[in-house]
Amino acid sequence: MSKYSFYINKYQEDLLKDLDTLVRIPSVSDESNPVDKKPFGQGVAHAFEAYEDIAKRLGFEVEQDDGYAISANYLDGEDYVGVLGHLDIIDAHNKEDWEYNPYKLTVKDGILYGRGVNDDKGPLLINLYAVRILRDMGCTFKRPVKVIAGGAEETTWNCMKHYFKTHKQPLMGYSPDGNFPIVNGEKGILTFETSYPKADGVFKVVEIRGFEQDYMIPSQIEVCVYCENVEDLSSELKNAFKDHEATFTFTGKSALTRNPQRAVNPLFALADFVQKYSMYFDGGFVALLSDVAQYLKDPYGQDCNIYYEDVDMGKTSIAAYMLQMKENAYSVRMDLRYPKGVDPLQIEASLCALFPSLKKIREKRLLFVPKNSELIQKLADAYYSVTQEKAEPITKGGASYARVLDCGIAFGATFDGYDTKCHQPNESMPLNDLLRALEIYCEAIYLLACE
């Protein structure tokens, strides 16, 4: 039993009810039709309203930021401790692949299921409860605490851009949108798209399916083609056609594009197939997939001359994904993650030499905080006090709001050894992990704000 156990047990039922309230809201960020005070659509606005109700009930003052972000504040003052998370989510695509309703909290055999239980509604919520528990214990706060929720982390980050235009940076802080023990490095992100013009072919590509979710290598893709003269084809191809159309399916293993080494990318199986039957496909499609296979197969970028390994942050990575058919061209995207010691302009130059019409569509600066910093030392102490394990900092390819902080890192809430299926069907988190993370956050906020 720790000093926080009584209060964690006291609040567990309320915590799960509040998490269910948040999970039930399909708060997918949508900036296509912004209205006053709802720049990210009705879903995010609804989540902000629910968050406000919860925070006020727990004793926070709540500040709205024009619908871009919402802050639950305990005490006033400029030199505050900041906890930055998000209430927007990735849409629960392929609901038939979910074992349980993604928009309802399900607790089964000690596991919490639902969109947002891990990313990031659950971790954000338990930080509200951590502050409440410290107050109940009579702890003296020497610094204010703000638990800030954004509404566009999964998309544009316009939430935090707007918030910090008018709000001072915290003295120090963290984002509960990563992993334990401590994420002191987040690789730089570059996303490019290259396009190849369409040409004539015996096969006309009618549709490409499987790339509905951004920044995800799918487990399966399908290419539907039309052929006018099926009788002219070889027998092995002819049998695949019905009414002049055929659908070819290629399977692999899904993974986030930031972890291409964990995937079996079905794009490369498609590329092999198209190369084998290149005499039937249009030249642009053949050329694009040939270059994808030649330059992007190695997940660390050795084939496209961008490989680098840093002693602290690890290797570069690159993933090919999002094959699309446009009006006059075919395109594919490349998601790159790079450590310190790499010049992003050199990466772009290397890829420009290999791919025509390269267009940069996303860039985020890397984050690296030396492990001897005061912030990391205090968070390491908090982690050790609960787990009795030394907190060795790690680097991730993902992006958290820690990148917008002058002094901040990602800290939890995912523990090593459990696959939360973040951004995928059946997102989940063990209840014991959530409660253990709550205990760690209690100690972390105590060390940052009360000592």
Predicted regions span which residues?
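Predominant activation on well-ordered alpha-helical scaffold segments within soluble catalytic domains
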Residues: 20, 52, 125-132, 161, ...
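Acidic/His- and Gly-rich active-site-bordering loop/insert found
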Residues: 2-113, 137, 141
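An extended, acidic, His-containing surface patch that forms the Zn2+-binding/catalytic region
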Residues: 258-327, 333, 337-349, 357-451
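Acidic-glycine-rich active-site phosphate/pyrophosphate-binding loop
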Residues: 94-107, 194-196, 241-250, 381
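Active-site metal-coordination/substrate-binding segment of hydrolases
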Residues: 80-149, 155, 168, 424-427, ...
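Acidic, glycine-rich active-site loops and adjacent beta-strand->loop/helix elements
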Residues: 87-89, 145-156, 176-181, 212, ...
